[in-house]
């Protein structure tokens, strides 16, 4: 998740560059959950012993990276079209705690088709040259990496982003690269 202090830092940096064009009232910063990410960037949480406390260098790298991505997007502002679509993706995941889910009141369970959310939502961003990006939400908990993993990973959502971007020719070197984001839906 994004710590509130990172959001505040990014907003301050954006205001230094753009004035009041971007503020906490009109910028949404979202992170995709992973069990394979580094810690050390939370200022609002006590030291859990798992991440060793605050690492200013890591905090700076995250705040600078988010700020740079927003500046890059602002530099490329242009008219475009946003398409939206949704659909059902069956058999792609499982409820991590089906027993606990069954303890929900019957009225709550009756609201849903299954014990997991199988709906996927997709936004597609298009300009005069074609598709320039996509944003996808699907409720699949990113725990594909096991406990023996010692590497930083975006898990299956990061891998999906990488694959989608490569299919669209992204080389991470130009302002016109396709951007794919597979965001976290339900927790």
Model-derived features with residue positions:
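Conserved beta-alpha junction segments in alpha/beta enzyme cores
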Residues: 1-187
């Amino acid at each position: 998740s994004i710590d509130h202090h990172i959001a505040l830092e990014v907003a301050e940096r954006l205001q230094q560059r753009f004035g009041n064009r971007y503020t906490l009232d009109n910028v949404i910063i979202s992170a995709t959950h992973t069990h394979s990410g580094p810690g050390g960037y939370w200022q609002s949480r006590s030291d859990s012993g798992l991440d060793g406390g605050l690492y200013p260098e890591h905090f700076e790298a995250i705040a600078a990276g988010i700020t740079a991505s927003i500046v890059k997007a602002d530099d490329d502002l242009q008219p475009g079209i946003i398409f939206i679509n949704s659909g059902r993706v069956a058999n792609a995941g499982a409820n991590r705690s089906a027993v606990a889910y069954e303890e929900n009141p019957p009225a709550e369970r009756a609201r849903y088709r299954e014990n997991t959310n199988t709906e996927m939502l997709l936004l597609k961003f298009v300009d005069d040259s074609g598709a320039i990006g996509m944003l996808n939400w699907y409720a699949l908990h990113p725990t594909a990496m096991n406990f023996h993993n010692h590497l930083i990973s975006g898990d299956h959502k990061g891998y999906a982003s990488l694959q989608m971007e490569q299919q669209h020719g992204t080389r991470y070197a130009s302002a016109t690269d396709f951007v794919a984001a597979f965001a976290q839906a339900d927790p």
